[in-house]
């Protein structure tokens, strides 16, 4: 296909302590450093566990990590404790249905958050 300049992002469900949940430890399904440029986590239910973040960082071995999907935005305390996320993506309309205007403003107004501002 002659595809060049691609980044391969691996995004896994973040491990959770919810009975019947389908998420498992990241290492169980990680394909390996030779196949992945960026490691990601899908985090819902405000389940931003420090141990899971640390596990992903250890697995990444210096590669970037991202919140490939989230329902609730990580708040400032979480982002201060977990500063290595290179981006976050709020799934579909969850930006409005799962976050208050105050929560959205808190995250998007942080100096560390880059956004596209209209001219």
Where are these regions (language model features)?
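Aromatic- and acid-rich polysaccharide-binding/catalytic face
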Residues: 26-47, 91
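Substrate-binding cleft of secreted/luminal carbohydrate-active enzymes
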Residues: 63-119
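Aromatic-lined carbohydrate-recognition surfaces of secreted/lumenal glycan-active proteins
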Residues: 1-24, 62-73
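Active-site beta-loop-alpha junctions enriched in small/polar residues
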Residues: 11-15, 41-46, 70-73, 90-95
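Extracellular structured ligand-interaction cores
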Residues: 5, 36, 85
